[in-house]
Amino acid sequence: MSQQYTLPPLPYPYDALQPYISQQIMELHHKKHHQTYVNGLNAALEAQKKAAEANDVPKLVSVQQAIKFNGGGHINHSLFWKNLAPEKSGGGKIDQAPVLKAAIEQRWGSFDKFKDAFNTTLLGIQGSGWGWLVTDGPKGKLDITTTHDQDPVTGAAPVFGVDMWEHAYYLQYLNDKASYAKGIWNVINWAEAENRYIAGDKGGHPFMKL
């Protein structure tokens, strides 16, 4: 069997994002949901390897969706955990990202207008997906975009993302997505977002390198 991906540890305790994201949600989201994507990605890559060795082209084609879905889930969640931080560790403090803050204000007129635009995008997602702040390069043009299901961001560099799958909020907020979207601003890791914006890396996810 080839080398496998593993579940990355959280950079903070499971209860550290309360009251905005409960300990129960964080434990289930990380230990169960993210682990499932990691397991699915490893299984799909092993199936791809065997299909290639057998020159089984139909199997090679059929396994691509599983690689995309589970690989995207692993990428998105690995980014998500790091773009959150407890309030006591600086979560929610936009002043920790002076370069990014200035770019946001230039693009949207004010930080509050940006938050309103981002939340409108989040609440407009139909079904399951993600909302993202992205840049087209190092300290580049900012934009708000969405991805469906577990599709990762492509063609741009993710600055930060918000998981809008029900498993990210339902046990705490039920169907009140607006309160989840409002609360998560209190735990955004702006220092991490600043680093991603300055780097503008469109594909360099170190956790995806075996």
UniProtKB/Swiss-Prot annotation:
GO molecular function, one term: superoxide dismutase activity
Cofactor requirement: Mn(2+)
Binding sites annotated in the UniProt record for Mn(2+): H29, H77, D163, H167
Chief localization: mitochondrion
Cofactor note: Binds 1 Mn(2+) ion per subunit.
CC per GO annotation: mitochondrial matrix; mitochondrion
PANTHER family: SUPEROXIDE DISMUTASE, SUPEROXIDE DISMUTASE 2
Reaction it catalyzes: 2 superoxide + 2 H(+) = H2O2 + O2
Role played: Destroys superoxide anion radicals which are normally produced within the cells and which are toxic to biological systems.
Family the entry assigns: Belongs to the iron/manganese superoxide dismutase family.
Pfam families reported in the protein's UniProt record: Sod_Fe_C (PF02777), Sod_Fe_N (PF00081)
Protein name: Superoxide dismutase [Mn], mitochondrial
EC class (word): oxidoreductase
EC assignment: 1.15.1.1
UniProt keyword terms in alphabetical order: Allergen, Antioxidant, Manganese, Metal-binding, Mitochondrion, Oxidoreductase, Transit peptide
PROSITE patterns linked: SOD_MN
Record's subunit section: Homotetramer.
Family annotation (InterPro entries): Fe/Mn_Superoxide_Dismutase, Mn/Fe_SOD, Mn/Fe_SOD_BS, Mn/Fe_SOD_C, Mn/Fe_SOD_N, Mn/Fe_SOD_N_sf, SOD_C_sf
Subcellular location: Mitochondrion matrix
